């Protein structure tokens, strides 16, 4: 029963949060992406540092890419973007609810569900957006970047370290947990994020180069706004859902496994 409620609550949260995220993206981020895409065919030459293994077939590959997305420039592209937002929100809602349940198990149920949802969502924002983006900020289409594998490895390192730091602060009781968290947060930047050698917009010149620089700056703030709105909405939705539908069966399960927790449950109610 608890598992079924978890799935349904995550789905409800995903539909609400994913819809809000889609609206924010359509309002602020998508226009920037579409504006940047108009400059892609003005790139004079690819940057050697980011050439793929199939560079010899780059021109044919680009034609296939353009053809594949031509039909998706309108409603179809919007539909799949919304589906992707809902699926991502579903996975994040599951994660938030599980961490909230872990909080209740480890720290009791005296803390209001909405407050726990805010703390967990803030940790999710720091782990999955803020800390990785400090080294690998979002880029507009047409921007050259460092090698994909190196970026993936560093992103994963940043997520693991920041997530571990949040878990240490949230669940550890030792007094030096702040030092451990600070050390974990510093690891990705001691290693160093992969950087591109040279100008990321080296293939562009004149007006295109200046326009893409401006769009890149706007896109940086747009992605941060979208991420903040996502996690803020997640907290606002997850708190009431957890309190109404997930906390009661969770308390019952905790009481069944540990009779001593009955006092904590009564205090929370």
What are these regions (language model features)?
Residues 138-179:
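A contiguous pocket-lining binding segment that forms or flanks enzyme active sites
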Residues 184, 244-269:
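Short, highly charged, low-complexity non-transmembrane loops/tails of multi-pass membrane proteins
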Residues 59-91:
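Individual transmembrane alpha-helix segments
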Residues 120-122, 176-188:
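Central hydrophobic cores of alpha-helical transmembrane segments
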Residues 104-140, 195-204, 263-269:
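Hydrophobic alpha-helical transmembrane segments of integral membrane proteins
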Residues 201-224:
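Short, membrane-exposed interhelical loops at transmembrane-helix boundaries
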Residues 8-32:
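N-terminal signal-anchor transmembrane alpha helix
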Residues 84-100, 157-162:
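Hydrophobic alpha-helical transmembrane segments
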């Amino acid at each position: 029963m608890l598992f079924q409620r978890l799935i349904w609550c995550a789905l409800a949260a995903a539909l609400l949060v994913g819809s809000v995220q889609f609206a924010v993206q359509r309002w602020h981020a998508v226009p920037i992406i579409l504006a940047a895409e108009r400059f892609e065919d003005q790139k004079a030459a690819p940057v050697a540092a980011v050439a793929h293994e199939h560079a010899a077939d780059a021109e044919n590959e680009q034609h296939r890419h353009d053809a594949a997305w031509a039909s998706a420039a309108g409603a179809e592209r919007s539909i799949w973007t919304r589906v992707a937002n809902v699926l991502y929100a579903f996975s994040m809602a599951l994660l938030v609810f599980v961490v909230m349940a872990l909080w209740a198990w480890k720290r009791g149920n005296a803390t209001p569900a909405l407050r726990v949802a805010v703390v967990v969502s803030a940790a999710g924002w720091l782990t999955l957006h803020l800390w990785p983006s400090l080294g690998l900020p979002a880029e507009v289409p047409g921007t050259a970047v460092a090698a994909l594998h190196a970026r993936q490895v560093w992103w994963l390192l940043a997520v693991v370290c920041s997530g571990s730091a949040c878990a240490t602060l949230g669940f550890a009781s030792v007094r030096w947990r702040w030092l451990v968290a600070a050390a974990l947060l510093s690891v990705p930047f001691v290693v160093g994020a992969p950087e591109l050698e040279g100008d990321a917009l080296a293939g562009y010149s004149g007006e295109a180069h200046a326009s893409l620089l401006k769009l890149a700056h706007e896109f940086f703030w747009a992605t941060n706004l979208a991420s903040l709105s996502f996690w803020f909405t997640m907290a606002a939705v997850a708190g009431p859902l957890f309190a109404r539908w997930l906390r009661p069966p969770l308390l019952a399960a905790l009481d069944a496994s540990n009779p001593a927790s009955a006092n904590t449950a009564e205090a929370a109610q």
